[in-house]
Each structure stands twice: as structure tokens, then as C-alpha cells.
Design a protein with these regions (language model features):
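Cleavable N-terminal export/targeting peptides
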Residues: 1-24
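Transmembrane beta-strands of outer-membrane beta-barrel pores
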Residues: 29-33, 67-71, 98-102, 133-139, ...
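Outer-membrane beta-barrel "beta-signal"
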Residues: 225-237
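Short glycine/proline- and aromatic-enriched beta-strand/turn motifs that initiate or cap beta-hairpins
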Residues: 20-70
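Short loop/turn motifs that connect adjacent beta-strands in outer-membrane beta-barrel proteins
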Residues: 19-21, 58-60, 84-95, 121-129, ...
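Solvent-exposed loop/turn segments connecting transmembrane beta-strands
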Residues: 40-44, 69-76, 102-111, 137-146, ...
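Outer-membrane beta-barrel transmembrane domain signature
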Residues: 138-208, 214-216, 235-237
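Membrane-embedded beta-strands of outer-membrane beta-barrel proteins
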Residues: 50, 81, 114-116, 149-153, ...
Length: 237
């Protein structure tokens, strides 16, 4: 699962989080291969995601690592790491980021991004969003200069028992076949039931069950919109 790039708000995705930092591990079963047998015949069924958000006096650091699995073991790994520097007491932060990874068949081209994030939180911390316009450098491309716009959001319901969160990205890229410019879109909304917020469940049993729906255009399949749902478990630390 390609999870949010700029989750400045990630600490709030675990409702009323105890420390001022957050990390989790997710396990997803992906139905994309069954739904698009012709377009995605080898799409991995299993993916794990590890995420961490850590704020400090200067801003915050966020990263995630996705690992896809085949019968033989890990098939590919992809990660993104970002650093944000607070701009005084404003809701803005300077943003720098690296994206890259590899698989047993190819390596992902490196991408380097720089931009500015705007973040908003409700006073109750029950809802919020970020938006980040960025310059994007596509390494090893004949036309490396590009752009990306990223948005993230979260909303808690039912006294923190339910969380709706996710991200949306749109960016300029190059077609793998002919090198022409194209625009890629992807969004991955997630819906979680946080079991540790239910009556009678120990709050230290920090398991969530839920789903993610990857909606993309020009991402998984060129010139086509694809919807890949998952069933998922998440343990928050």
C-alpha cells in the first residue's frame, strides 16, 4: 500500500495518541488481481506497510516502507521519507522528500521533492488535513523536471472508535513505453475500526481492522482507472 507521503498529521490517526509520535505496521490482502485478471495478472496479494511519524522542536520526520510478497518471499520494497521544518508558529512547513525502491525484476527510479506544506487541525483534533505542492525531480529521466500535489486527511468518529483517513497525489510523469508526458493520479482512503476504543477492550490492545481502496489513473495500468480494495489489520505502537 502506497500510504500518505506527507502525513504531518499522522500522530492523530491513532485517536488521542498517548505520545507525540506514532508508528504502526499494517497487513493488507489485496483483491486487485481477482478484479483485474487481465490488466494485473501478477499483482501481489499481500503487502505489509511500516510507518513512523516523529515530531521534534524543528518540525517532523515521516517515513513508510511497503513490502509486497510472492510465494517465494518478498517481491518488492518501496519507501518514502520526508522531513518538514516548521516556519515559525504558522501552519506552514518547508518539506523535503525522497522516494525510491527496488524489486526482483527492476528498480524504481529515484525521485526528489521539495515544497511547502499547509496543515489544519480542528480544535478538538477530531479532523484535519494537509496540502503540499512540490517540485519533483525524476532521476534518470530525459525530462527530469516535474511537479506533484499531495493532500492528506483524517476524521475520527464514535469517540475515536472509527477513523477515516488517507491521501491523494497527482503528479507529472513520463510514459514508460514512449517517454511522453502524462499525469498520474492516486488516492488511498482508509477506514479503520479501532478495537482498543471499544467498551471492554484493553486500551493497550492497539489493533485496528479495516480496509483501504486504491483508486488510480495512469498508475497501476497506463491510460486506465483502476480500483483495488483491500482487507487490512493494523497494530499501532
Amino acid at each position: 500500500m502506497r500510504t500518505p507521503l506527507v502525513l504531518l498529521l499522522f500522530v492523530l490517526l491513532a485517536p488521542f495518541a498517548r505520545p507525540a509520535q506514532a508508528q504502526n505496521i499494517q497487513l493488507h490482502y489485496d483483491f486487485g488481481r481477482q478484479l483485474y485478471a487481465k490488466d494485473q495478472p501478477t499483482r501481489p496479494r499481500w503487502t505489509t506497510t511500516v510507518e513512523q511519524f516523529r515530531p521534534d522542536r524543528w518540525g517532523n520526520t515521516f517515513y513508510f516502507i511497503d513490502m509486497n510478497y510472492a510465494n517465494e518471499g518478498v517481491e518488492s520494497a518501496y519507501w518514502e521519507i520526508s522531513r518538514e521544518f516548521s516556519l515559525g508558529k504558522t501552519p506552514f512547513a518547508a518539506h523535503i522528500e525522497y522516494d525510491g525502491g527496488l524489486s526482483n525484476k527492476f528498480s524504481y527510479n529515484n525521485a526528489y521533492l521539495v515544497g511547502v506544506t499547509y496543515a489544519w487541525n480542528a480544535p478538538s483534533h477530531q479532523a484535519g488535513f494537509t496540502i503540499t505542492p512540490m517540485y519533483k525531480y525524476l532521476a534518470k529521466q530525459s525530462k527530469p523536471n516535474s511537479w506533484q500535489l499531495t493532500g492528506t486527511w483524517y476524521r475520527h468518529f464514535a469517540a475515536g472508535a472509527v477513523t477515516f483517513c488517507g491521501f491523494a497525489d497527482v503528479w507529472g510523469d513520463r510514459n514508460l513505453n514512449d517517454g511522453k508526458n502524462n499525469v498520474v493520479f492516486i488516492t488511498e482512503p482508509q477506514l479503520w475500526l479501532n478495537l482498543y476504543k471499544l467498551h471492554g477492550v484493553n486500551p493497550d490492545f492497539r489493533l485496528s481492522v479495516g480496509t483501504e481502496v486504491e483508486v488510480s489513473h495512469n498508475f497501476a495500468v497506463t491510460d486506465k482507472t483502476i480500483v483495488n480494495p483491500t482487507l487490512a489489520l493494523k497494530w499501532s505502537f
